[in-house]
Each structure stands twice: as C-alpha cells, then as structure tokens.
Amino acid sequence: MKSLSSAQIRAARALLRWSAEELARESALGLATIRRAENAETHSMTAANDLTVRRVLEAAGVEFIDENGGGPGVRLRKPLKGE
C-alpha cells in the first residue's frame, strides 16, 4: 500500500468538510502531525500514522484512488449523511 500524498489528505478532508483539527481528533494524532503531513514541502509521516489517517478517512467514506497513470486521487465512496 503506497503512502498517502499531502494532496490526497487535504482533498479527503475537503470532501468530508473536516478541519485539520477534526482529522487530528478523529485519528488521535497531534495537529502538528496532520499539518506536516498536509504540507507538500515537509510531508513527513511515519508508516503507522499514515495507516491511521488512511483508516480514519476510509471509515468516514473516503476512497483513495491509485495513480494508474493519471495521478493519485480521492473520492467519496458513499454519500455524506443528510445529502
């Protein structure tokens, strides 16, 4: 499993309408960890934290799309509640 890119994490949060603080809370990681992971220049996250963020976002309905020649991406697997 390839690690998440900073753009994928930011896009996943945007799809869920989550703030960085919400992602930090849901993943039980520090806000500074989330901010570093989302910064393309300092993208730095351990494999364990990457997996934690992936699992939290996937549980919330995000699906990560492999590069497949067109670049990695994200989409919602199911509609948000109330939509």
Enumerate the predicted regions with their spans.
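A detector for short, charged/polar N-terminal pre-domain segments
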Residues: 1-5
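Short basic helix-loop element that most often maps to the first helix and adjoining turn
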Residues: 9-22, 82
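Residues in the recognition helix of alpha-helical DNA-binding motifs
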Residues: 12, 26, 37
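Residues in the helix-turn-helix
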Residues: 22, 33, 52
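Recognition helix of helix-turn-helix/homeodomain-like DNA-binding domains
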Residues: 29-45
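DNA major-groove recognition helix of helix-turn-helix/homeodomain DNA-binding modules
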Residues: 47-65
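Helix-turn-helix/homeodomain-like alpha-helical modules used for DNA recognition
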Residues: 62-83
